[in-house]
């Protein structure tokens, strides 16, 4: 699994900025993901002599009107290129004015297959890949275990966490944080099982879609504190699943422990770092990190069988292999 967060993006730009010519008059970001790197590239830049003479780029001035007659070299920037469809759409949108400018195209992250589709790219990041700015709405969440407190909603304050009426009020009215638009595979929380009605009510009110909700089956908060099993409880659910490829956890301490126990990656929303110091061979094969050609072959077979299974000639053996390939990638 290849993951990049905003710190990685900023570092990548700083490390590879020299590949871009310095004569671009205008940088155009592709909404929405391309706007952030576009702003980073368009920050005021100068050299020593220019600085001494008080000359800097004025990209930060609000309300400034640029004379388009002075714009000649334009760089269109997106965060990444995958299939190439988004970049192709950009070219089509700019087709009517491309004769007026020298327009070139840049992405920060490219896949090997489409790196030639742009004029500049900063880093090759192959599949499977995920970014901080899109992972919470990515289809990978369908194969993800996710914590609730600190991820979907704020953590309770010490005053609210009384295992009584104040806590029940918090559960029903917790302020939301990251609410995905896609379905989450499994919600795994250290909340006690007795608070399932309140938890489900909050999830429904905040339009959180999920397939499964796993809660800690202990009698009260005191028993939970004695057990001190937050990370091990979550790791047991995550590690026992062959479908779930990721765990999203709010606590860095727990994230590291879940990764250690399962040998599977954990995304920590405390820092938006991906923890995968410990890995298993099974995970590496399934994610494509080991023998990526094998994963590509499995995907091709899955897609081929999926199209074939709709026909009347697909027998039980065909359906069995289709199910196998679906679970394997």
Label each residue range with its predicted role:
Residues 178-200, 214:
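Substrate-recognition element of Asp-dependent hydrolases with the DxDx(T/V) motif
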Residues 1-145, 153-174, 194-201, 205-209, ...:
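PRPP-associated nucleotide enzymes
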Residues 196-244:
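Substrate-recognition "cap/lid" segment bordering the active-site pocket of phosphatases
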Residues 23-27, 184-187, 242-246:
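Short active-site oxyanion
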Residues 278-329:
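Membrane-proximal basic amphipathic "stem/tether" segments
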Residues 106-108, 243-286:
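Acidic, Mg2+-coordinating phosphoryl-transfer loop and its flanking beta/alpha structural elements
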């Amino acid at each position: 699994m290849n993951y990049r967060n905003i710190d990685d993006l900023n570092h990548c730009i700083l490390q590879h900025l020299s590949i871009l010519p310095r004569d671009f008059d205008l940088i155009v970001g592709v909404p929405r993901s391309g706007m952030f790197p576009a702003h980073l590239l368009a920050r005021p830049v100068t050299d020593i002599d220019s600085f001494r003479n008080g000359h800097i780029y004025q990209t930060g001035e609000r309300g400034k009107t640029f004379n388009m007659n002075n714009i000649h070299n334009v760089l269109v920037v997106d965060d990444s290129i995958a299939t190439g469809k988004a970049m192709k759409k950009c070219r089509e949108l700019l087709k009517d004015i491309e004769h007026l400018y020298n327009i070139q195209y840049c992405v920060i992250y490219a896949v090997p297959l489409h790196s030639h589709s742009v004029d500049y790219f900063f880093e090759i990041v192959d599949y499977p890949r995920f970014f901080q700015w899109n992972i919470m709405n990515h289809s990978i969440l369908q194969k993800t275990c996710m914590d609730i407190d600190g991820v979907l909603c704020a953590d309770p304050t010490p005053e609210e966490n009384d295992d009584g009426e104040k806590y029940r009020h918090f559960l029903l009215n917790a302020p939301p944080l990251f609410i995905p638009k896609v379905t989450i595979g499994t919600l795994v929380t250290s909340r006690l099982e007795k608070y399932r009605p309140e938890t489900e009510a909050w999830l429904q009110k905040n339009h959180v879609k999920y397939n499964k909700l796993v809660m800690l089956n202990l009698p009260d908060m005191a028993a939970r504190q004695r057990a001190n099993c937050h990370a091990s409880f979550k790791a047991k659910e995550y590690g026992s699943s062959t479908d779930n490829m990721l765990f999203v956890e709010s606590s860095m301490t727990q994230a590291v422990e879940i990764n250690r126990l399962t040998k599977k990656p954990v995304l920590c929303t405390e820092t938006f770092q991906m923890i995968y110091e410990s890995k298993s061979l099974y995970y590496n094969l399934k994610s494509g990190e080991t023998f990526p050609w094998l994963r590509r072959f499995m995907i091709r077979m899955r897609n081929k069988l999926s199209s074939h299974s709709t026909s009347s000639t697909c027998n039980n053996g065909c359906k069995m292999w289709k199910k196998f390939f679906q679970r394997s990638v």
